[in-house]
């Protein structure tokens, strides 16, 4: 039974991270930027799982850390969406360009 080489996992993780980075740097909608940041975190999780599975001494450390990272990412997404809802109520927009002042 053939296994998938490590280079395939790493290539996929690099592609996911680059797509997320491109979206986070170029998009103006804050919700899309938040989704792109989550995509970058998932690329890092893919690296953790790939290195823990395909390393010299395979163990579950990377997979457990990846689950912990997913829980932190879910909390980050919930907090980010709550902040976005509060900003939308105050300014009626979620565009990044229009949120450049600290005072309302």
Swiss-Prot record:
Keyword entries, A-Z: Cell membrane, Membrane, NAD, Quinone, Translocase, Transmembrane, Transmembrane helix, Transport
A Pfam family of this chain: Oxidored_q2
Keyword ATP-binding applies: no
Membrane topology: Multi-pass membrane protein
Cellular component GO terms, alphabetical: NADH dehydrogenase complex; plasma membrane
GO biological process: ATP synthesis coupled electron transport
Superkingdom, natural source: Bacteria
Positions of transmembrane segments: 4-24, 31-51, 67-87
Coiled coil residues, start to end: none
Catalysed conversion reaction: a quinone + NADH + 5 H(+)(in) = a quinol + NAD(+) + 4 H(+)(out)
Localization annotation: Cell membrane
Assigned EC number: 7.1.1.-
GO molecular function: NADH:ubiquinone reductase (non-electrogenic) activity; quinone binding
PANTHER family, alphabetized: NADH-UBIQUINONE OXIDOREDUCTASE CHAIN 4L, NADH-UBIQUINONE OXIDOREDUCTASE SUBUNIT ND4L
Family, similarity comment: Belongs to the complex I subunit 4L family.
Role according to the record: NDH-1 shuttles electrons from NADH, via FMN and iron-sulfur (Fe-S) centers, to quinones in the respiratory chain. The immediate electron acceptor for the enzyme in this species is believed to be a menaquinone. Couples the redox reaction to proton translocation (for every two electrons transferred, four hydrogen ions are translocated across the cytoplasmic membrane), and thus conserves the redox energy in a proton gradient.
Quaternary structure, from the entry: NDH-1 is composed of 14 different subunits. Subunits NuoA, H, J, K, L, M, N constitute the membrane sector of the complex.
Name assigned to this protein: NADH-quinone oxidoreductase subunit K
């Amino acid at each position: 039974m053939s296994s998938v080489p490590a280079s395939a996992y790493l290539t996929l993780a690099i592609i996911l991270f680059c797509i997320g980075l491109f979206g986070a740097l170029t998009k103006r909608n804050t919700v899309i930027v938040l989704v792109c940041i989550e995509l970058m975190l998932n690329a890092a999780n893919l690296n953790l799982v790939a290195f823990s599975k395909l390393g010299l001494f395979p163990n579950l450390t990377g997979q457990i850390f990846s689950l912990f990272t997913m829980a932190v990412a879910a909390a980050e997404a919930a907090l980010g969406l709550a902040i976005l809802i509060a900003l939308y109520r105050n300014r009626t927009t979620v565009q990044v360009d229009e949120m450049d002042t600290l005072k309302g």
